[in-house]
Regions:
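Substrate-contacting helices/loops that form the catalytic groove of nucleic-acid
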Residues: 1-63, 151-171
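Positively charged, low-complexity nucleic-acid-binding target-recognition regions
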Residues: 51-55, 63-171
Length: 171
């Protein structure tokens, strides 16, 4: 049973990484940025059964395979720490650092301190709603490329979207 599960998992990883590299090639991207936190699976509490399944997902192995496949196509893969990327707003130009996190916003009496409206929905200072994962992804990019800026008049990121697109991978 474990062998079959592992084979399905690695088959999915190979298909997913191929789709990511193909998507990057179609967009003309030469760099893929991935957020990664050390020991991020240890503090998760989703329930006994879900935790058992979730802990077994080889995130590091997926990154290794993605780096290998991207390197074959001439694409660079960069991993970076994700800290404070989901607590700060890309649209408002906030740097993803401790001083702009929820705790420090609360100390400075900046409201709202937690701008997650619902699960998966983030609100910028001007009220613009953006998918929380998309906001976090743009902040991860800003951690690597700190000179990237966004304004409604000057977009340095081509194809900026506020809601993610869904990619279906047949297993």
């Amino acid at each position: 049973m474990t062998l079959k599960r592992n084979q399905k998992l690695f088959d999915f990883i190979h298909k997913a990484t191929k789709s990511i590299v193909d998507y990057a090639l179609n967009c003309g991207a030469n760099t893929i940025v991935i957020g990664k936190n050390k020991n991020w699976k240890r503090s998760i509490h989703l329930g006994k059964r879900i935790n058992q399944n979730f802990i077994g997902i080889p995130h590091s192995r997926m990154i290794e395979i993605l780096k290998y496949k991207a390197n074959l196509k001439g694409i660079t893969v960069i991993t970076t720490n994700e800290s404070y990327t989901s607590q700060t707003s890309f649209l408002d130009g906030e740097k993803p650092c401790r001083e702009n996190g929820n705790y420090h916003r609360k100390l400075k009496y900046l409201s709202p301190s937690n701008r997650r409206i619902y699960r998966g929905l983030f609100q910028s200072n001007d009220g613009t709603l953006v998918n929380a994962d998309v906001n976090g992804a743009y902040q991860i990019i800003r951690k690597v490329f700190s000179d990237v800026r966004f304004s409604k008049f000057n977009q340095e990121i081509r194809g900026l979207v506020l809601s993610p697109s869904k990619l279906t991978i047949n297993v």
